[in-house]
């Protein structure tokens, strides 16, 4: 069973989301499409087997992370997501179209933990060979960890297909 952590920016502004509309607003988020159920990606759990590939367990990130007393929401999110990366085998990083400073940080953390990392980029936005906002961290991560793959895609559906077809890490 491959334990997968997904990292990427939500495409709905956080200030628009509340407990009454969270499931509706995030139902089209790529996490929901990968897992096959919006609720399983919103509320923190120990992991859920994805609908279209019984060989993959989604272990994070979640919209609502577990909250520890004494920590701010932001401190808690960082703490919980680093724990999720610690227990995963694979980090899927979505660097298409949206600025994702947290994703860059999670990729770097995963690289130091020697995790398998697959970074998906839009060729029109990011060219790590020449220009684009992500070239430096992508090259750095590739130099730190031999288990990093960069895949240029035209559509986020390709990320879903990749996860649905995962059999083993290599």
Feature map (PLM): residue ranges:
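Conserved catalytic or regulatory cores that recognize and/or transform ribose-phosphate-containing ligands
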Residues: 1-170
